[in-house]
Curated annotation (Swiss-Prot):
It is found in: Cellular thylakoid membrane. Its main location: membrane. Belongs to the complex I NdhN subunit family. Its EC number is 7.1.1.-. The lineage of its organism: Bacteria, Bacillati, Cyanobacteriota, Cyanophyceae, Synechococcales. NDH-1 shuttles electrons from an unknown electron donor, via FMN and iron-sulfur (Fe-S) centers, to quinones in the respiratory and/or the photosynthetic chain. The immediate electron acceptor for the enzyme in this species is believed to be plastoquinone. Couples the redox reaction to proton translocation, and thus conserves the redox energy in a proton gradient. Cyanobacterial NDH-1 also plays a role in inorganic carbon-concentration. GO terms for cellular component: plasma membrane-derived thylakoid membrane. NDH-1 can be composed of about 15 different subunits; different subcomplexes with different compositions have been identified which probably have different functions. It comes from Prochlorococcus marinus (strain AS9601). One of its GO terms (molecular function) is quinone binding. It is a peripheral membrane protein. This is NAD(P)H-quinone oxidoreductase subunit N. Keywords: Membrane, NAD, NADP, Plastoquinone, Quinone, Thylakoid, Translocase, Transport.
Length: 158
């Protein structure tokens, strides 16, 4: 493990590709170093888990409804057969409050995402010029990353 990870190559690859798949050693440490380097370069960062993400575009960017868990017999007259739907603010809403900064969304446990969900993450990056996304796709013996589009081609097309 190098003592100094400048993050220059990572920053350049992130700027050119906008969406990266990263493979980090399981003992950790690299992620926080890279996040700290990106914050120093002017990025506003947000880290979250990819588990339970559902539709990434709606869950991350738009106001959406979530039904609370069913707790047994309830009155059907008030809410109908569908139940009560509570509105939830987008998970990454604090990222989008500032329009002047570059934004970095870091998704942990990205290996649970399907091909279509990964493709929608790439589409989100292309629609928003200031948004970049890093998806952790699993462990590796050394820190590696590649464009998410290349990862999809390698992983799902073979």
């Amino acid at each position: 493990m190098p003592l100094l990870l400048s993050g220059k190559k990572f920053h350049n690859d992130l700027k050119t590709n906008k969406c990266l798949a990263i493979f980090a050693p399981l003992e950790g440490g690299y992620e926080t170093r890279l996040l700290r380097r990106m914050r120093a370069k002017g990025f506003k960062t947000f880290i979250t888990s990819a588990r339970g993400l559902g539709d990434p575009e709606v869950f991350l960017l738009k106001l959406h409804g979530v039904r609370p868990p069913h707790l047994g017999h309830q009155s059907v007259g008030r809410n109908g057969a569908l139940g009560e739907v509570q509105q939830v603010i987008p998970q990454a809403s604090e990222l989008f409050n500032e329009n002047d900064k570059n934004k970095l969304l870091w998704l942990l446990e990205g290996q649970v995402l399907s091909q279509s969900e990964l493709e929608s993450l790439i589409e989100i990056c292309t629609n928003d010029n200031k948004l970049t996304i890093v998806v952790e796709m699993g462990g590796s013996r050394k820190l590696e990353w590649k464009p998410l589009s290349n990862y999809i081609l390698d992983e799902f097309e073979s």
